Amino acid sequence: MRARWLMMAAALGVAACSGEGGDPDAGAPAQDTGVLADSGVDSGVDAGSPADAGSPDSGDVDDAGPSDTGVDAGLPPLGPVTIDLTSNRPPDLLSTMNLFRIVDGRFEYNDRVVPYDLSTPLFSDYASKARALYVPEGASIQYTESGALDLPVGSVLIKTFLFGEDLRLPQEELHPVETRLLVRYADEWRAFPYVWNKGGTDAVYFVRGEVRTLAFIDPRGVSRTAQYLIPQKNQCLECHERKDADDRRFTTPIGPQARQLNWDVDFGAGPENQLQHLADAGMLSGLPPLGQVPTAFPWASLATTGTTALAYEAVTEAARDYLDMNCAHCHRPDATQGMTSRLWLNYDNTDTFHLGYCKEPGSAGSASAGRQYDIVPGDAEASILVYRTETEVVGDMMPLLGRSVADDVAVGIVRGWVDGLPPESCGN
């Protein structure tokens, strides 16, 4: 068996939400104010070792790359991956599918389960994420230049969310909180959410969702308290649902785009391009020369460059890619919020009005905090988009789901982009 290992601080996986039309078991998320990384769910499995953290220097712990140590812990091999596409309900225990296990603070992935990292990741209250994808034997991903890569039936996208009490420490223990699976059925993508037990040894299928109060020190040394949302299954549609040209609804992954994977990470034998790695493994077809593949802004580079030293061109790229990954799943022409608000934040939108320049909001209401336009070029303070990106006021903050505290690094980037735009006098 080829085992793949990953430090817990690595950012691996993709958004995991469902194309199903609702789950009768999923109600409003419950409130849980228990201790950090206590799932409130116990599978009865004996507790094992917690996870180790990596370096969070960039201001967002979701930024490290995968690695493959080749370590053999002396455990029996994982059994074959088991994905039952005939059932609408997954196994009660995540371990039943044999996608991965956590040993001595590391992820061990099964054959044809490959960790990956996003160039510009989604921010989720500073949670670290372990991302991976599974492709069945004999099948391969089809390259697409824009949007998510086309994964074959039977594929699984895996994203595990992890937290620690002090995110400044390179070896701070991280604890798995939840794992979201996105499974490719013949007719749609379906989501299966799991919550980890107290010992971090297994995760239980859990569709109702809950809110946890988590106290931690962020990578900049700021003490924070997040109202961390483990979403219920039905909430997935709020981010992942789109409409096609015939107005039919469908669900799509968000993260694993070619432009987000076109950069080097360490799989254990030195830096490798992630797309090339998949192609060399026979798991990706149609890959053009890498020089022809678009590339998203390398968010991890901010750990060394910081934000103040960036040229304005780089600030613009970083801001547009951040908005694309964190906002454009809703704010785009083929998503419900984009259709309603007419604010399109996808990175390839070149229409400045629909990007928000001097555009009055369609439905912001009191969330505009007295501001009149989505973006006032040259004036971040007067721009609704900047306010909603940085505020922590419930009902005003954006995105609506997935964060309760501000991403200070991203706020600085977005502010710098708007302030640097050629000034316009909106309304005149």
Tell what function each PLM region has.
Residues 1-15:
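Sec-dependent bacterial lipoprotein signal peptides
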Residues 14-78:
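Ser/Thr-rich, Pro/Gly/Ala-heavy low-complexity intrinsically disordered linkers and tails
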Residues 17-18, 239, 323, 385, ...:
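Residue-level detector of buried hydrophobic side-chain packing
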Residues 20, 242, 333:
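Cys/His-rich metal-chelating microdomains
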Residues 64, 69-133:
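N-terminal pre-domain segments of enzymes
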Residues 83-86, 319-320, 324:
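Long, charged, low-complexity terminal extensions
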Residues 122-124, 128-138, 143-321:
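Extended surface/linker regions that mediate inter-domain or inter-protein docking
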Residues 263-320, 328-335, 341-428:
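Electron-transfer interface patches adjacent to heme c in soluble/periplasmic c-type cytochromes
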